[in-house]
Amino acid sequence: MSEFIAENRGANAITRPNWSAVFSVAFCVACLIIVEFLPVSLLTPMAQDLGISEGVAGQSVTVTAFVAMFASLFITQTIQATDRRYVVILFAVLLTLSCLLVSFANSFSLLLIGRACLGLALGGFWAMSASLTMRLVPPRTVPKALSVIFGAVSIALVIAAPLGSFLGELIGWRNVFNAAAAMGVLCIFWIIKSLPSLPGEPSHQKQNTFRLLQRPGVMAGMIAIFMSFAGQFAFFTYIRPVYMNLAGFGVDGLTLVLLSFGIASFVGTSLSSFILKRSVKLALAGAPFVLALSALVLTLWGSYKIVATGVAIIWGLTFALIPVGWSTWITRSLADQAEKAGSIQVAVIQLANTCGAAIGGYALDNIGLTSPLMLSGTLMLLTALLVTAKVKMKKS
């Protein structure tokens, strides 16, 4: 694959960024994220309409994450010789199909099939996002392009739940998914118009995805990714009970805190390209260290609302560096195998999200209110130490 990348770079060196293609990828990612989290705000009417409990309806989110984890691992093995342009179009079609299947679902089984289609698109698209980006812009512009994509993710995360809730009351949950299907159609046409041909890996150069873990620093990097995202979900999944019981926020106050977090995350993502240009490794070690300190501050002085609000803003600003930073690490240190590295990264993140939320919940129920914070802070500190000691970084 390294020879293939080198040959393509020599023959088709990118001198000007293709921003239209980058924004089409960003829009598609945003649509995927919005649709992934729509059931969170529409769970009650979906459950009532289908005659199931809200807990069962919630599995529509779980199945998407589960399928996405496996799709991210095996998608690049399946499509290696296929033009990536057609693969991305297929993912946009799957996004649209998923929305339509959910919209017309008259049973829980059909609902799960629709959400599984979304998982295929989500896992596959995320696995390819870093490698797609580095083939659309010159190397020096990759961090900026990645910040555009993750900026779209931040916006999607901020608007998904309130938008779904508002539209659900206005037009009904099925029409919300019909509207999402219309966004999927727009994705298809924008990608067809803007995304150039991106040849896949020749079949004679196929390599086992997991052999990448034998490279110096790669296993350490994946462990660091796991710990940082597990630390994030150990805390953020339970921000509502922590903030309402520790700091005494009401529902309205918590809403403002979450909005502040979302805005800070968007700002952090927007600024990430400037920080990563200076030092990717410093950002990947420094960000979790700041988060570890923030968790400690919240544990000790979180009963003060101004402290709790400040920590939420700092957390949003700082954590935004981590996903962009690790994607930049892949495009620089594993440029010859960016798709396969992206596959492992997405699977690790999905597993980390699940483990972090599960262990954080156990700690909250069995140890105490601040235990998710202590768990998160410990994982973030270990991440900072591991990155400093073991993660290798190539210069751009």
UniProtKB/Swiss-Prot annotation:
Record topological domains on the Periplasmic side: 43-54, 107, 169-175, 237-255, 303-305, 365-366
Keywords, alphabetical: Antiport, Cell inner membrane, Cell membrane, Membrane, Transmembrane, Transmembrane helix, Transport
Membrane topology, record value: Multi-pass membrane protein
InterPro entries xrefs: MFS, MFS_dom, MFS_Efflux_Transporters, MFS_NepI, MFS_trans_sf
Gene3D superfamilies recorded: MFS general substrate transporter like domains
Cytoplasmic side: 1-21, 76-85, 129-147, 197-215, 277-281, 327-343, 388-396
Signal peptide: none
UniProt name for this protein: Purine ribonucleoside efflux pump NepI
Species whose genome carries this gene: Escherichia coli O6:H1 (strain CFT073 / ATCC 700928 / UPEC)
